[in-house]
Amino acid sequence: METKEKVQIDWKVVFKLGLILFVISAVAACALALTNYVTAGTIEEMNVQTNTVARQEVLPKAADFEAVPAKDVEKIASEIGMEKPEELLEVYIGKSNGEVVGYTVKTGPTSGYAGEVQVLTGISADGVITGITIIKSNETPGLGAKASGVWNDQFTGKSAKEELVVVKGTTKEGSNEIQAITGSTITSKAVTSGVNMSIQVYQNLSK
C-alpha cells in the first residue's frame, strides 16, 4: 500500500512572495498618487480657464469676473423662490475698469430629453441677454444636441425684464418668445428654463 507523501510548505518562500506583491502594490499606489498630485493642479487650472472663456463669450464686455460667495448664491435662490436651490450653480459679476457691466449665471440640471442640461447665461447691467452657452448636456446627438450655435443666438438681445416663452413656429419680432427646435421641444424648454432662472437672478441683483 502506497503512502501519501506529505507536502511541505516553505513559509519563507510564501513570506517572500507576499512581501514582493506588497512592495509592487505599494509602488503602484504611490505612483498613482504622485500622478494625481502632479496633474490635479493642471486639470484645475484648465477648468478655471475654460470657465473664464465661457463667461467672456456670454458677457463680452466684461474684462474681469468676481464670484458671488456661495452663501449669497443660496440667499438669492431662496429669495427668488427656487424649488431646487441646488440648481443655481454659480453667479459671477462681470466688470470692466472697475464698473459692473453685467452678470453670468450658471444653472442646472434642468431636465432635457435625455438628461441634465447646464446653461450659462450672460446678462448686461441694463437688462439685456448678451449670450448663452450650454456647458453640459446629455442630450441625444442630432436631436437635443441641436440646442447650440445658431439656435442659441436667438436669446441674444432679448430683454431680461420678463421671462421667455418657448413657442412652435415663427416668433414675433421684439417679443419674449423663443422658437422651439423642431422635434425637440423638451430640450428647448429645458434650456429656456435655465435662462429664465438666470433672468430671475438678474432681477434680484438689480433691485
UniProtKB/Swiss-Prot annotation:
Pfam families: FMN_bind. It is a single-pass membrane protein. It is an enzyme of class 7 (translocase). The keyword Nucleus does not apply. GO terms for cellular component: plasma membrane. The modification FMN phosphoryl threonine is found at residue 185. InterPro entries: FMN-bd, Ion_transpt_RnfG/RsxG. The keyword Protein biosynthesis does not apply. Its EC number is 7.2.1.2. It catalyses: 2 reduced [2Fe-2S]-[ferredoxin] + Na(+)(in) + NAD(+) + H(+) = 2 oxidized [2Fe-2S]-[ferredoxin] + Na(+)(out) + NADH. Belongs to the RnfG family. The complex is composed of six subunits: RnfA, RnfB, RnfC, RnfD, RnfE and RnfG. This is Na(+)-translocating ferredoxin:NAD(+) oxidoreductase complex subunit G. The gene is rnfG.
